[in-house]
Amino acid sequence: MTYFIDRRANAKNKSAVNRQRFLQRYRSHIKRAVEEAVNRRSITDMERGEKISIPAKDISEPVFQHGPGGARTIVSPGNKEFVEGDRLRRPGGEGRGGSGEGSASNQGEGMDEFAFSLSREEFLDFVFDGLALPHLERKQLRDLDEVRPVRAGVTRDGVPSRINIVRSMREAQARRIGMRAPIKRALREAEEALESEERKDPVLRNPARIGELKAEIERLEKRLEAVPFIDTYDLRYNNLIDQPQPSNKAVMFCVMDVSGSMTQGHKDIAKRFFLLLYLFLERNYEKVELVFIRHHTAAKEVDEEEFFYSRETGGTIVSSALTLVDEIIAKRYSPAQWNLYVAQASDGDNWDDDSLTCRDLLMTSLMAKLQYYTYVEITPHSHQALWEEYERVQAAHPSRFAMQQIVEPGDIYPVFRKLFRKRVAS
């Protein structure tokens, strides 16, 4: 019997490559299961993993086998029932056992579905696969505080982790050649002189000279051996310098309507949408700030806790939120240095002529500063004035203004993917 002993020092994640290959192979099954899981989960249960089941028929390997049809001549072992020339009845069915759906059977075999668990990281990978912030640009920072280490040749000083082995060995070889060359030349001359002296007639030889040459040869050989293979003088280190870089910093304004017209069901849908957005940004972008704004008749910037869990409510003036967004941009986020995004969720109900004010704010001020604006209307009913005014904004900015309607919780994830799908750079 053969035994395989794994002596790798790191015993963790040995099958990571095989697992990734498996996830890639059954990607379509997993994505369907992940989408169903996202639609049925509550807003507080979005970050855990998921158990996935794949039907046995989908994981079976393709094989070649004889089908039930066709004419065949075979030689079977002897038996007591048949003799030469007897005709055998062809088996019925499709050549398979009797297992599967339907009534019970006393024949055949079957297999349960193959089930496995996705980790939290794998689950979120599939949730946000193929999504990205639209029109994300690199902005040049005025204070140049965004730097990136870049290679800038080699240096004689540095830390061991930056040692350049190839350059160090090249320097060591050059030093050895340079130091050993004169010694080898002197050694060669001494050996030739000794050989010449020893070839002389014994009467003419100079024993003292021979002794001096042998001593000189021994001294030179020791000098050759003393030349070190590598010396601290030979060491070279990769030199890194901090180079100012453009930044892809971004800020996302999350604007949620909490007015009295928003039912608890509407608010839960809005929270689930923003939670998906929050997880997406937190997972995929290191330098994205989030600004949370709740509004009814008045808008207020709040923290994450208050945004998701506060029970404050009131009337509806949407323009108060857009005005606050414009003020915050003017105070803290220069469009020259930041990529600016807005995600708004509302039921579409607004106070009298305020929808026209919202359109004017967007057309005259906000859209010139923003990379992308998304509006989600949560209602099963027909659209109202706010949607109609926003349609005019979308017509003027078709690539940077997006609108979608959500009727039920099952629409959240598909709508989210439509709004933030990766776009081909123009």
Swiss-Prot record:
Pfam families: DUF444. Residues 82-93 have a biased composition (Basic and acidic residues). Residues 82-109 are annotated as: Disordered. InterPro entries: UPF0229. Disulfide bonds: none annotated. Belongs to the UPF0229 family. PANTHER family: UPF0229 PROTEIN YEAH. This is UPF0229 protein Csal_0882.
